[in-house]
């Protein structure tokens, strides 16, 4: 959805959302928790938003709530930019997003796991595009948010290793497959990269894969 800023109410932003060709715009609320830290919300500015909720309000009718921080917005943006996703040859398997990090010293970041239905299609390359053209469109819309696109794998060890990109992993030990607990060995020079600033990289990798990940020096 494309939404336009029309006014400010307390900490929320009221936006006008296009409801289709020839139809009037409808109002939607963008709550504070769903805003992005790098957005500049000013009157008549337009943004891509994700429709998060429609609730019935007594005497007011349906109330729309939209989000800029929801992982669904990232999916929506990639679907718009990547023809292979639209055609079904590439699919988004999982998304882990930290749009509002707990500390200001850490920027927003998202990890996206992708897979291809057709063997000859490179799903990561399709999402990144020639010279990064496709992913750059998504990054621009999210005001510079860092996005890691990684290859999904049925092999949990390979999937965990991929999820820690851009760090280089030497070995993944699935110490408790039933409890989804893994130890990951990385070279000493890759340790800080694998963990990420204030633990952001490993935190997102854990959320993406569903595994508890302990990182150790090899």
Regions found by a protein language model. Give the residues of each.
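RNA-contacting regions in translation and RNA-metabolism proteins
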Residues: 1-218
